[in-house]
């Protein structure tokens, strides 16, 4: 009798999770082919910022153009997983850096693998005036961010994304405040093809021989995807970049300095510094601060 009850409960849980992932994949499909202009607010402990998001569908990929509405006309453009930063006021275009909204782009990209996450439909409510269903994506480990998504009951589009800490506190909330048709995207789309080709060549040259620094404690969900150096006032500082397909972080290894502020957080972005021997290590990226501490936990004192 007890075994029968256990198997029945397990079967029910698997069925409910399958329904949840089906609802989430429906949202991804709707978002992929949406051609919309949205006003989006991003709020966290540092305050709130407003953005304009232009989203179109091209070559079976989602193209997003995020523009800051606070001050300078700046932001980033993304096609699939290829993108770049821009600042129209300074006539600048350069490598893609971290942005709070990149988690939105990657999470709703149908190519992002969510193996290692469980899915639960937690109910219905209203968000930004819309009737929504709530989808909770929780990591099966204890160190990554979780996600609570509000899905529009009418058009299956995302209305809000809350990024959750490992203890379920809200780190950052991304909310769609208004939606309208796209007026037009003034962007040369060939730049994405050039970037994609360049990245493909670089990855073939680099990823075949990369090895994780042995002093780091990297969870199995994260892969080493890039290694390089940055110029810090004339000093070349080596780094390694890790990703689980949804979030990324870098580890820098520099000459030892006086660490004044060992840890900082800004929404989903954490920075942690730690000295070991003659070196100072810095973990920077879209991970909780406790996760960053774990990455450096094996360093000798």
Predicted features along the sequence, with ranges:
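N-terminal leader/targeting segments and the immediate start of mature chains
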Residues: 5-61, 69-72, 114, 124, ...
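Short, solvent-exposed coil/turn segments at beta-strand boundaries
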Residues: 30-33, 55-64, 76-82, 130, ...
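Short, hydrophobic/aromatic-rich segments at coil-to-beta transitions
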Residues: 32-37, 60-65, 129-136, 157-160, ...
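An acidic-aromatic
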Residues: 43, 49-105, 160, 165-175, ...
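Short, surface-exposed coil-to-beta transition loops
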Residues: 48-52, 142-147, 159, 171-173, ...
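Short N-terminal edge-element motif at the start of the domain
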Residues: 89-144, 153
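Gly/Pro-enriched, hydrophobic low-complexity segments
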Residues: 128-196
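Short, solvent-exposed recognition patches
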Residues: 194-277, 290
């Amino acid at each position: 009798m007890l075994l029968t009850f256990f198997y029945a409960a397990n079967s029910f849980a698997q069925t409910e999770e399958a329904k949840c992932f089906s609802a989430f994949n429906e949202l991804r499909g709707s978002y992929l082919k949406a051609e919309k202009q949205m006003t989006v607010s991003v709020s966290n402990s540092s305050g709130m910022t407003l953005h304009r998001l232009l989203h179109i569908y091209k070559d079976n990929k989602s193209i997003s153009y995020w523009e800051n509405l606070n001050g300078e006309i700046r932001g980033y453009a993304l096609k699939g997983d290829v993108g770049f930063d821009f600042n129209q006021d300074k006539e600048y275009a350069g490598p893609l850096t971290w942005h709070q909204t990149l988690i939105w782009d990657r999470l709703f990209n149908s190519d992002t693998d969510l193996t290692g996450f469980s899915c639960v439909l937690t109910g219905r409510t209203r968000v930004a005036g819309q009737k929504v269903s709530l989808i909770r994506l929780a990591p099966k480990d204890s160190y990554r961010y979780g996600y609570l998504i509000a899905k529009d009951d009418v058009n299956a589009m995302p209305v809000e994304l809350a990024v959750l800490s490992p203890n379920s506190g809200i780190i950052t909330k991304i909310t769609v405040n208004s939606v309208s048709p796209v007026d037009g995207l003034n962007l040369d789309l060939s730049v994405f093809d050039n970037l994609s080709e360049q990245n493909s060549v670089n990855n073939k040259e680099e990823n075949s021989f990369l090895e994780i620094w042995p002093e780091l404690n990297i969870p199995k969900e994260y892969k080493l995807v890039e290694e390089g150096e940055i110029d810090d006032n004339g000093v070349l500082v080596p780094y390694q970049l890790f990703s689980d397909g949804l979030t990324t972080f870098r580890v820098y290894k520099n000459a030892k300095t006086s660490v004044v502020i060992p840890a900082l957080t800004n929404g989903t972005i954490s920075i942690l510094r730690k000295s070991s021997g003659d070196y100072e290590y810095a973990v920077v990226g879209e991970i909780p601060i406790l996760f960053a501490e774990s990455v450096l936990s094996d360093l000798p004192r």
